[in-house]
């Protein structure tokens, strides 16, 4: 089966979401393979404007499978908010949206670390969105992040959360002088 890959090379804002939306009627699935909700894509269907941050824009095409892959970092609260907004507007998610169990979660402590790190850098700050994407990828690379599938196993989730909270609270207080 042939594949079409849309890749941006300018750190965002190149129109990947719009291009993906144009290609969507010609494919079986749209897969988001990396990134977080710090980015967004706006798609206009008819006279309706949709702004998506986590969910692939293919979701606006009925019956098209859309996948949030294992390379994506997901803010659960933001994802639920985005899903609810789509459902309110009549977009069907059941059977159309799939989320990898191996996708890592953006937790509140990731956002706190993102903001504390920026504050500590002062004039050298990088201009992060403060949504915790970078720190979530740090945990993914360090193999200590919490994944979507961990939400399905409460004892595992609680164990990972406790370990992460101990480490993140120490990092915030001792390195960043934050709470």
Predicted regions, residues:
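Non-transmembrane, aqueous-exposed alpha-helical and coiled segments at domain scale
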Residues: 1-179
């Amino acid at each position: 089966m042939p594949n079409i890959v849309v890749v941006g090379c300018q750190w965002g804002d190149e129109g990947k979401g719009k291009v993906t939306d144009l290609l969507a009627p010609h494919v079986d699935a749209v897969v988001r393979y990396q990134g977080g909700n710090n980015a967004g894509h706006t798609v206009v269907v008819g006279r309706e404007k949709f702004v998506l941050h986590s969910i692939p824009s293919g979701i606006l095409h009925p019956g098209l499978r859309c996948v949030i892959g294992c390379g994506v970092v997901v803010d659960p609260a933001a994802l639920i908010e985005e899903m609810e907004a789509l459902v309110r507007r009549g977009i069907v998610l059941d059977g159309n949206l799939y989320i990898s169990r191996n996708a890592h979660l953006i937790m509140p402590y990731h956002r706190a670390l993102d903001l504390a790190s920026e504050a500590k850098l002062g004039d050298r700050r990088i201009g992060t969105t403060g949504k915790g994407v970078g720190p979530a990828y740090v945990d993914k690379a360090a193999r200590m992040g919490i994944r979507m599938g961990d939400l399905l196993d409460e004892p595992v989730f609680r164990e990972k959360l406790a370990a992460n909270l101990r480490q993140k609270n120490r990092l915030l207080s001792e390195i960043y002088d934050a709470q």
